[in-house]
């Protein structure tokens, strides 16, 4: 299929404002957050920005008929090159699909579109007393769809797990253009765990157009402890001792001397620059349990 004819078919699906093929418009989409020296420059032939699952399915069917490769993309914050069009073709960018469709407080889930920003979801559910636990370092800009594609984690995965632990069901457009729904709110869905197969598949098995995500209740109390050590080995032993004592922090991060100096130079956070290492230990839960765990660590 000629490029002009392909563009016209795509515009008929998503509108002229949702299709880009001019080289200057494609510059943004030939990169993601991965290292250019490793990933290289990978420019798609055309970028499509759908607003509905039906539009995604229609675009995939057009690509299949034309024999054109498809690359799904969220915010492009990934570091592994998964959002790059390595073989050109059509890039389907899902950042216009940003609706939170349902918040179910009784069953503790939300149904969202893939373009919803990770942190925005937690800010939306916070007034209801819940948050979305996976918290990648790019959570201010990364999308739920991207989190699902990469099975993203974050500092709080120590206690709460990674994205796969918080996805109950998915609406997915398959490479054939067929739309399916996997999983659901039931604790044990019958049949093969297709949801588990799809999470982390980086868009190779299908394109997520809706997600039923597990919501976690906001903790009653949170306490963050900062501990300085003369050397990194001592900090490492402290980590082992905390876990061995039966304390499960919500997050547990270590900074070496070089990182401490870099953070202080940039943010003046107040960390001791003469320390060999610093531990940041976040404890959350019921107030009494947080106080008890904090005392044990100290």
Regions found by a protein language model. Give the residues of each.
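Noncatalytic alpha-helical scaffold of FAD-dependent oxidoreductases
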Residues: 1-298
């Amino acid at each position: 299929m000629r490029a002009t004819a392909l563009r016209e078919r795509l515009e008929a699906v998503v509108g002229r404002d949702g299709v880009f093929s001019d080289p200057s418009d494609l510059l943004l989409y030939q990169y993601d957050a991965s290292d250019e020296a490793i990933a290289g420059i990978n420019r798609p032939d055309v970028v499509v920005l759908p607003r509905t699952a039906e539009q995604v399915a229609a675009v995939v069917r057009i690509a299949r008929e034309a024999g054109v490769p498809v690359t799904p993309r969220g915010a492009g914050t990934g570091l592994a090159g998964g959002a790059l069009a390595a073989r050109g073709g059509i890039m389907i960018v899902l950042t216009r699909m940003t609706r939170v469709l349902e918040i179910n407080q009784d069953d503790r889930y939300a149904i969202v579109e893939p373009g919803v920003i990770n942190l925005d979801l937690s800010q939306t559910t916070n007034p209801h007393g819940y948050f979305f636990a996976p918290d990648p370092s790019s959570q201010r800009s990364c999308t739920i769809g991207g989190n699902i594609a990469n099975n993203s984690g974050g500092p709080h995965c120590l206690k709460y797990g990674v994205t796969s632990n918080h996805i109950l069901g998915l609406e997915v457009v398959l490479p054939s253009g067929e739309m399916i729904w996997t999983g659901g709110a039931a604790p044990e869905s019958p049949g093969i765990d297709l949801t588990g197969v799809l999470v982390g598949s980086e868009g190779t098995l299908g394109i997520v157009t809706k997600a039923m995500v597990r919501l976690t209740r906001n903790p009653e109390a949170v306490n963050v402890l900062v501990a300085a050590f003369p050397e990194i080995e001592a900090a490492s032993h402290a980590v082992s001792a905390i876990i061995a004592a039966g304390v499960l922090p919500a997050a547990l991060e270590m900074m070496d001397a070089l990182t401490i100096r870099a953070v202080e130079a940039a943010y003046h956070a107040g960390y001791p620059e003469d320390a060999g290492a610093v531990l940041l230990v976040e404890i959350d839960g019921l107030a009494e349990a947080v106080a008890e765990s904090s005392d044990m660590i100290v």
